[in-house]
């Protein structure tokens, strides 16, 4: 009975998910024979996860009807829905509604895409000799580990499904429209994006979980203390407008809002990030979500638990006044020329196809005397129009009418003697338990628009 309990629970969760999306209730993976007995604590954990899959109350309360909170939110929601209309602009793969449907497709198909990878792992395991397999099963129970992974994929899939449903309500997408988009894409032989949905779950760790605190603490204190210093230059009742482009899942913007005295606008182009953000922003209490973001890869784990361990989020309630403006940073804020007191670019400027366009937009959106704070690497992507060294960036930015100001030693050591740019090591890896580390020597500066 013990040996079959996990499979029974997985079957229940799978049936629930299948009924929700109209697919077969049977798991796509074949169940292995002779599953080792589960320990009682593993059974308890699996039951809890299965309950989480089927209990909407454990996934956070959603605001009724997604009513915008403030006049600022209502105004932006109206503009967003106009941009999202199929008749707004040309219907191409870059249309925001098309990109949204692609993201919804991927979140809806999380289970199928990850179960296919698990099937591949199970097939590969069959290539091990009988003697080797016996050793593996007697010592570590490799098949049981794969079965545990399956159960946790279903937990993640339930959250991804809920994310998609939340987004469909927010953006007003009918199920038929999404079904038609998915059917056409799959008829054309395309597959839903597996990587982007997995990255969203990992970004939840970085932005909204206790486990992301180390990475946040390498950048956020520098930025937040600089903002407080700038705020001290103004009257106490002055509210400064702050823009954070490339905001991802938005935590930095919410921490800025929590300082008080700032009107915070965040901006993001990726619909995968925006769907994830809308879901997190809908949470009204802490630790409403439990998921397993590291079950999608076997590498760099010291223990099995490091791969399977749960993450709880959010570790703080999102600030209700933060406003997300979706779209291309260079164009979506065209009506905000000279509007912002401060622009904060955190791990952002090197994402530009045209770095000079980013610089132009920052200059255009800032008020005279406004500040631009940068914290991040210079890791250029594929096909950028221009790639500048730090020294070249300094010269170009000064030529555009910015003056560098010292941001202070909390933001690292001076990169160049005599130049007011600092360097600070910053990890970007999501998993503090992993046997690998990815870190940048982030470049930090503050400039004033003259």
Predicted regions span which residues?
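A short acidic, Gly/Pro-enriched loop at the edge of an enzyme's catalytic core
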Residues: 330-343, 437-439
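Core SAM-dependent methyltransferase catalytic element
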Residues: 400-401, 416-450
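Conserved beta-strand signature within the Rossmann-like core of class I S-adenosyl-L-methionine
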Residues: 369-381
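A short glycine-rich, Lys/Arg-flanked "PGG" loop and its adjoining helix->strand segment in the class I
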Residues: 356-369
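Conserved class I S-adenosyl-L-methionine
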Residues: 235-248, 255, 263-268
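Conserved Class I S-adenosyl-L-methionine
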Residues: 291-296, 379, 383-415, 422
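S-adenosyl-L-methionine
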Residues: 281-336
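N-terminal accessory segments
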Residues: 2-236, 240
């Amino acid at each position: 009975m013990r040996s079959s309990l996990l499979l029974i629970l997985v079957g229940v969760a799978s049936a629930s998910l299948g009924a929700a999306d109209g697919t077969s209730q049977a798991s796509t993976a074949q169940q292995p024979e002779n599953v080792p007995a589960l320990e009682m604590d593993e059974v308890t954990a699996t039951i809890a996860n299965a309950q989480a899959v089927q209990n909407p109350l454990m996934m956070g309360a959603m605001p009724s009807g997604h009513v915008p909170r403030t006049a600022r939110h209502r105004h932006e929601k109206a503009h967003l829905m106009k941009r999202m209309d199929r008749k707004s602009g040309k219907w191409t793969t870059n249309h925001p509604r098309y990109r949204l449907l692609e993201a919804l497709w991927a979140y809806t198909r999380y289970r199928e895409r990850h179960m296919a990878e698990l099937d591949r792992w199970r097939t590969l395991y069959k290539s091990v000799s009988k003697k080797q397999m016996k050793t593996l099963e007697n010592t570590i129970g490799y098949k049981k580990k794969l079965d545990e992974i399956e159960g946790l994929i279903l937990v993640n899939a339930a959250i991804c499904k809920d994310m998609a449903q939340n987004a469909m309500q927010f953006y007003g997408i009918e199920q038929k429209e999404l079904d038609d988009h998915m059917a056409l894409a799959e008829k054309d032989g395309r597959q839903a994006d597996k990587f982007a949905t997995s990255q969203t779950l990992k970004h939840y760790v970085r932005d909204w979980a206790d486990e992301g605190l180390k990475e946040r603490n390498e950048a956020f204190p520098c930025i937040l203390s600089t903002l407080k210093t700038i705020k001290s230059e103004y009257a106490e009742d002055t509210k400064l407008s702050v823009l954070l482009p490339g905001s991802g899942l938005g935590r930095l913007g919410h921490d800025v809002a929590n300082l008080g005295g700032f009107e915070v606008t965040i901006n993001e182009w990726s619909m995968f990030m925006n769907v994830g953000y809308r879901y997190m922003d809908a949470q009204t209490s802490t630790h409403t979500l439990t998921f397993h973001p590291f079950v999608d890869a076997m590498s760099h784990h010291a223990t099995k638990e490091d791969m399977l361990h749960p993450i709880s989020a959010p570790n703080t309630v999102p600030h209700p006044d933060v406003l997300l403006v979706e779209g291309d940073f260079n164009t979506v804020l065209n009506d905000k020329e000279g509007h912002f007191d401060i622009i904060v670019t955190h791990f952002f400027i090197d994402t530009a196809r045209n770095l000079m366009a980013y610089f132009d937009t920052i200059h255009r959106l800032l008020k005279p005397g406004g500040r631009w704070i940068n914290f991040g690497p210079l890791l250029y992507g594929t096909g950028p129009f221009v790639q500048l060294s730090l020294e070249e960036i300094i010269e170009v930015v000064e030529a555009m009418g910015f003056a560098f100001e010292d941001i202070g030693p909390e933001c690292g050591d001076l990169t160049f003697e005599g130049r007011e740019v600092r360097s600070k090591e910053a990890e970007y890896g999501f998993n503090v338990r992993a046997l690998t580390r990815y870190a940048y020597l982030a470049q930090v500066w503050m400039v004033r628009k003259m």
